[in-house]
Amino acid sequence: DVTFSMLGANGATYYQFF
């Protein structure tokens, strides 16, 4: 989550789905 956090809130949510 922390790494993907850089992309933004949307990026974090997208990673969660996967």
Swiss-Prot record:
Keyword Hydrolase: yes
Post-translational modification: Glycosylated.
Job of this protein: Inhibits protein synthesis in the rabbit reticulocyte lysate system.
This enzyme's EC code(s): 3.2.2.22
Record field: catalytic activity: Endohydrolysis of the N-glycosidic bond at one specific adenosine on the 28S rRNA
Keywords: Glycoprotein, Hydrolase, Plant defense, Protein synthesis inhibitor, Toxin
Organism expressing this protein natively: Siraitia grosvenorii
Biological processes, Gene Ontology terms: defense response; negative regulation of translation
Family, as annotated: Belongs to the ribosome-inactivating protein family. Type 1 RIP subfamily.
Protein name, per record: Ribosome-inactivating protein momorgrosvin
Domain of life: Eukaryota
MF-aspect GO terms: rRNA N-glycosylase activity; toxin activity
